[in-house]
């Protein structure tokens, strides 16, 4: 599966709840396109998930759900490696080595930790604090060239680049010079950032207590229509220019979803609906969502009834990841001087 002529892409999704439209447009849809021209590893990052407490039964179920969605959305196990992070122990081993490379000051600057910890900083897990080091290990273990990232992960990838450079410098006299390639970000289009259906200023999230805030893969057609019909909007007609969207976050969100699903430019969608009321637009958006989600939902139903197949795909991905990571960890341990 590994092809040295192709650039290596690594990315992952946390199994922390029901995946939704935001995960699809913001990540998984891009994964499907990337596998055609890249050497892709798509991980279910369960070690990242437990930096915040997870119900063990739910975690096991969610892992299989993410695997199902990867496949149902179009990730091809013949073109990409799909595996569970914790089944490849070298992720944790390399994370510890990188813990010893990373400077405390670097971690202190990570804004996502500050946001997630909030005022309860003294009581959150140390795993949440060192989360970026594990992310760096995920990426560097496979000598990744490209990492798809959104706004919330850009800083972590910058840290990964710093860690890789420091490792190369620290061990330059011991075979480590230029050992890790410095991974580049694959910046996702802003239009792929999907916001809550109830508040256009907040990201669509699994953790939002309101199920009406998101479109989930297992929503039936009637529920999709209901969620879109009740999605928050403003009383004005749809605008005619992108500049008009700056102060209309809910309109911007729904139009951007339409743009991403249809493959049309946002300005073209605006031209089609300029001056119209939201009622007709919401009907058309619902139809478009159903056309995209229904085939995935039907495939999910089939996969849910074939857990043996899912486990075989994950085992195949784990074997590929182990083969590759065994080689890299042997070299890393030799460079560092570990037994």
Where are these regions (language model features)?
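Internal, conserved structured core segments that host functional sites
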Residues: 115-171, 196
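Short, solvent-exposed beta-strand edge segments and adjacent coil->beta transition regions
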Residues: 16, 144, 210-212
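Conserved nucleotide- and phosphate/pyrophosphate-binding catalytic cores
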Residues: 23, 161-339
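Catalytic-loop motifs flanking and including active-site residues across diverse enzymes
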Residues: 94, 129, 156, 224, ...
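N-terminal Rossmann-like or analogous alpha/beta NTP/dinucleotide-binding catalytic cores
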Residues: 2-10, 15-137, 301
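Short helix-capping/linker segments at secondary-structure and domain boundaries
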Residues: 104-108, 141-148, 259-269, 297
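A generic secondary-structure signal for well-formed alpha-helical elements
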Residues: 67, 74, 102-105, 144, ...
